[in-house]
Each structure stands twice: as C-alpha cells, then as structure tokens.
Amino acid sequence: MTKITFNDGMKIYWDHPIEMDDGLILRADIFSPEKVGKYPVIMTYGVYGKWLDFRDGYKPQWDIMVDKFPEVMANSSCKYQNWEVVDPERWVPDGYVCVRIDSRGAGRSPGYLDPFSPRETKDFYNCIEWAAQQEWSNGKIGLNGISYYAINQWQVAELQPPNLAAMCIWEGAHDLYREWAYHGGIYCTYGGNWYKGRCIPRQNGLGMNGYKARINGDYVSGPLTLSNEELGYNRTNMNRDMLSNKLVTDQYWQERIPDFSKITVPVLSAANWGGAITSFSR
C-alpha cells in the first residue's frame, strides 16, 4: 500500500504500485513538489534498490565523494541519496518530479530478475507511459542516471515511448557485447562479478536477510523472506547466459544492443575514455 508523507519540502509517495502489461506490480518512490501541479518528470529504473542508502550500499565511495567534493552535502540532507541516481532534494525545488522504480525482481518489486533483458526494457517503457498519465505529470518524461541507469536508457529509447522527452546518459555503454562482456572478443569476467556482487544482494525476496532502509527501517528487498532455492528460481544466471552466447550475432546480444537509428529524442551523454565509446562514435 502506498504511504504518503510530507518531508523536506516534498510530497513523497512510498512504494507506489505500477502495473505492467502482464499484471505484475512494480514499486516506485515518487518525490514531488508539495504544491499541486503538473511537472516534468525525471525517472530512473533499475536493480540497485531504491531504499538502499548510498552510505550503506557503497560506503567507501560515499566517503571519497564527500571528502573530495564536500559541496555535495550543501543544500541537501542527503538522506534520499541513492547510488547513481538524482538527489530529489536538488531537483524537486526546481519544479521536477523524481520517480525511482525498482526493476522487476529487484528491491521492492517482485518477479524474475534478468538485467538488461527485453522484458525489463518493456517494463521501463510501461513506466514512462504510466508516469505521463499521472495527475502530477505534464506528460514530459526525462531519464537521468549513471552506468546501469544510463545503459537502459539507450535500450528503452529504441522502443520510442511517445512521452519520452530527453535523456541524460552518464557512462552508459551501448554495445553490451563489445563494451561490457567481450572486450576484443575475449570474455570479461566483470559482468558476472557485477551481477553476483551488485544485483543478487538486492534481489526481491531477501527480506530480513537483506539490507534495512535507513529512511524507514523497512527491508530494502521486500517484506517477504524467500529460501535460497526460491531466490534461485526467481533469477537468471547471468554468467552462464553470457558465456553461452559467445557471438555478437547471437539473439541474446541482439536483443540487448539497441539500434541507434531508432533513437530520436535529445541526448546528453558523457563518460570517461572507456566503456561507452560506441555511443560517442555514433
């Protein structure tokens, strides 16, 4: 059930349901201005757990960030900070609604965990179009995020959601085969390690065996606590998937590498000299 609170100048909808085309319910947190109105939306959709505090999931990175860039702490309590997504305390005062969605099988959203899959991309499309129809939305949906939350922007943009207005892609690979899994045709172990270390610990169904949210004391990975066997049935084996699809022409990769010619919305893309090279060259 959605809980609504008024905190830090924002109206916040916690764990709001979004129904997918197959009937599955995803869960979203919505940060909006307190004043009733129709606002542009900044959306993220992904696997890292919308209730997982930056300081709990990535403490070394947090400590480095606040040491090197103390201005991050200015004008924000930082208690809504999550990994690689926008801080609503910086965007909502400027007249935006920030929507964070736990992807299928991750965090508070049930279902089968399969990152970057066509099903996940379709869900993202559905979320964009859902947000455009809400009473607090002006129908213009922007996407903004880093890494995972950037990669899946390329993917969903290929589907051309009618209400997708613009994207801010920060360090987001486009070609998951060449830029992520098989560097120069040689298998890279990063993807499997990332899935094991960053996705599975946020899988829905961990319940009391997972993280607790600082913001409310509830469980980051849902109220239910499933057995290890049940959790295994509810997720893909990404390392196996990538190793068994060795060629870029395999259907697995073709379903995950978007066609740039079908992406028509304005894009701001930035990255360091690595990873996202294809998107710059195109």
Segments (PLM) and residue ranges:
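Conserved alpha/beta-hydrolase
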Residues: 88, 92-108
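Alpha/beta-hydrolase active-site loop
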Residues: 82-83, 93, 115-135
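Conserved alpha/beta-hydrolase "acid-adjacent" motif
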Residues: 275-281
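N-terminal cap/lid segment of alpha/beta-hydrolase-fold proteins
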Residues: 1-37, 41
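Short beta-strand/loop motif that positions the catalytic acidic residue
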Residues: 263, 269-271
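Accessory cap/linker subdomain of secreted extracellular hydrolases
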Residues: 51-55, 59-77, 81-88, 93, ...
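Alpha/beta-hydrolase fold nucleophile elbow
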Residues: 135-148
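A fold-wide structural signal in alpha/beta-hydrolase
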Residues: 24, 41-44, 92-99
